Curated annotation (Swiss-Prot):
The chain crosses the membrane at residues 9-29, 170-190, 195-215, 253-273. This is Short-chain dehydrogenase/reductase 3. Widely expressed with highest levels found in heart, placenta, lung, liver, kidney, pancreas, thyroid, testis, stomach, trachea and spinal cord. Lower levels found in skeletal muscle, intestine and lymph node. No expression detected in brain. In the retina, expressed in cone but not rod outer segments. InterPro entries: NAD(P)-bd_dom_sf, SDR_fam. Belongs to the short-chain dehydrogenases/reductases (SDR) family. It catalyses: all-trans-retinol + NADP(+) = all-trans-retinal + NADPH + H(+). CDD domains: 17beta-HSDXI-like_SDR_c. It is found in: Membrane. It comes from Homo sapiens. Its EC number is 1.1.1.300. Catalyzes the reduction of all-trans-retinal to all-trans-retinol in the presence of NADPH. Keywords: Lipid metabolism, Membrane, NADP, Oxidoreductase, Transmembrane, Transmembrane helix. The lineage of its organism: Eukaryota, Metazoa, Chordata, Craniata, Vertebrata.
């Protein structure tokens, strides 16, 4: 027993070195991308913004079928028609992911009409863009139901079949605000932090589940209607990401079976700074960059 423990202590650092070297090599040498031709993809919030771009990207990369969920039928119809014109089978369903029973009922309808979902992209989200004391209680609940609990319900609806098939992928379109919150978006930041913890736990829980993986994407501010009006102090230094960039990198992460994706790569510095700098220094960074007041001009989706 003692020798086994000593052996484990010796092997563990060697294993860590091997994994670090392997990851470094992967950054230099192109890896083989996963074939999507047999995959059925479901995207929540798929009618517009990043969701629409994700549908385009999956279609361009050969996904077999694409299913869109959302609450606005006009947007869902437009995106569905566009994907069909690209030559990919596409369907849409009206579904509020914040409503548990509606999620389960719609998931059943999807299985009956389309078949098994093998890639689930949890993209649906809302933001009210207010401080705690200025926020309506119902609005706060809505954010948590859609942004966080909605992922519980969709994952519970589709993961069991993925485990049976030993083929599946759960994707969470999160936000860098899950790691570094800002004033004026307390509902959104809280829900995204919760969703990040959810995915971190889920990813670890899938380690012994062959063929089923998870990916969490943490993008910086993206130029969509959702955060319309948001302004940082130095827009040339901190330009918003394009939705098509986020979509392309997200699908690539799925094909590479990448567990965590921070966009842009400079956001890795944020993780390091938060772990070593004192709170006072972090507060000065918020003030200097303009994230302290960036929601003052927030308008949101109109």
């Amino acid at each position: 027993m003692v020798w086994k423990r000593l052996g484990a202590l010796v092997m563990f650092p060697l294993q860590m070195i091997y994994l670090v070297v392997k990851a470094a090599v992967g950054l230099v040498l192109p890896a083989k991308l996963r074939d999507l031709s047999r995959e059925n993809v479901l995207i929540t919030g798929g009618g517009r913004g990043i969701g629409r771009q994700l549908a385009r990207e999956f279609a361009e990369r050969g996904a077999r079928k694409i299913v869109l969920w959302g609450r606005t039928e006009k947007c869902l119809k437009e995106t569905t028609e566009e994907i069909r014109q690209m030559g990919t089978e596409c369907h849409y369903f009206i579904c509020d992911v914040g409503n548990r029973e509606e999620v389960y009922q719609t998931a059943k309808a999807v299985r009956e009409k389309v078949g098994d979902i093998t890639i689930l992209v949890n993209n649906a989200a809302v933001v009210h863009g207010k401080s705690l004391m200025d926020s309506d209680d119902d609005a706060l609940l809505k954010s948590q139901h859609i942004n966080t609990l909605g992922q519980f319900w969709t994952t519970k609806a589709f993961l069991p079949r993925m485990l049976e098939l030993q083929n599946g992928h759960i994707v969470c379109l999160n936000s860098v605000l899950a790691l570094s919150a800002i004033p004026g978006a307390i509902d959104y930041c809280t829900s995204k932090a919760s969703a990040f913890a959810f995915m971190e736990s889920l990813t670890l829980g899938l380690l012994d589940c062959p063929g089923v993986s998870a990916t969490t994407v943490l993008p910086f501010h993206t130029s969509t209607e959702m955060f319309q009006g948001m302004r940082v102090r130095f827009p040339n230094l901190f330009p918003p990401l394009k939705p098509e960039t986020v979509a392309r990198r997200t699908v690539e992460a799925v094909q590479l079976n990448q567990a965590l994706l921070l966009l842009p790569w400079t956001m890795h510095a944020l993780v390091i700074l938060k772990s070593i700098l004192p709170q006072a220094a972090l507060e000065e960074i918020h003030k200097f960059s303009g994230t302290y007041t960036c929601m003052n001009t927030f308008k949101g989706r109109t």
